[in-house]
Amino acid sequence: MAESSGSWRDSYKGMSSDNIKGLVLALSSSLFIGASFIVKKKGLKKAASTGTRAGVGGYSYLYEPLWWIGMTTMLLGEIANFAAYAFAPAILVTPLGAVSIIISAVLAHIILREKLHIFGILGCALCVVGSTTIVLHAPQEREIDSVIEVWNLATEPAFMFYASLVIGAAVFLIIRFVPQYGQTNVMVYIGICSLVGSLSVMSVKALGIALKLTFSGTNQLFYPQTWIFTLVVLTCVVTQLNYLNKALDTFNTAIVSPIYYVMFTSLTILASVIMFKDWDRQNGTQIVTEICGFVTILSGTFLLHRTKDMVEGSSVILPLRISKHINEEEGIPLRRQESLRSP
């Protein structure tokens, strides 16, 4: 018994200072973005009372200060999220995006008077448990002294193979599947967003590390690799924005959000494990615990989104495809969809 206790202490050395910084930034990001959904929705409702609703093509919300406060809050959250990747591994930062769902659900219940059902409360609890599990067992951030080191990791055969598969699969979906199945199968648009998104997060992390080192006195801006990562970020984000908006415009958000969260987060973790070798610094118990934490978050996310379909305690099955104009006043979606979604 004493030996097993000692081995556990040896395997768990606590969180590094960088991981703590990344955790604080990620949680701050979730707080800002989760709150921004509520503020923006209040602004949209206020604007709709005096002008044309956004869901039917109106832009009166642009004259509503409350909506702009919400957008500013969301921008602060995205900046904090960007900074979090510079300090902590993607395995820690990315799953914590689910915390913003909890913030949104609770604030919607308090401020917007949107009923939070018992299963929604259970979903929030599962997200908290899963997030805590991942935080306590996340790997330490890799020590990197130059953007060249990140470039070397990105150009290793394993990650190059992964990146080639991702790009090939995304191009194949765009060319062959989008024209035929884009409007009928939700997995087409979400698949493109998730594949490209995993590469965008790796590039965002590389760019964040470069900026962190630059601000600490080691200038990384004169390395061409820094600008290559910047170009990749811009290309990937534009692609994500395009196909995510298509998905949200075509399908019900209650369907898009959980599927996208599962695929995006899973592929991002896989990309991080391959590129930064996060799991090489952990034992089997820690890895399995992290996976269990992630599955717990997924379960909570599913429950939260299912409660959107519950009216007066009865479950209503929504059609797979629904007009964005009908669904404009729907519940609070996941941060990564809404942060890229057009108003």
Swiss-Prot record:
Its membrane topology: Multi-pass membrane protein
Protein name: Probable magnesium transporter NIPA4
Keyword Cell membrane attributed: yes
Residues making up the signal peptide according to the UniProt record: none
Positions in the Extracellular compartment: 1-18, 88-90, 137-157, 211-220, 276-283
Cytoplasmic side: 40-66, 112-115, 179-189, 242-254, 305-343
InterPro entries per UniProt: Mg_trans_NIPA
Species assigned in the record: Arabidopsis thaliana (Mouse-ear cress)
Location of the protein in the cell: Cell membrane; Early endosome
Alphabetized GO MF terms: magnesium ion transmembrane transporter activity
Subunit structure: Homodimer.
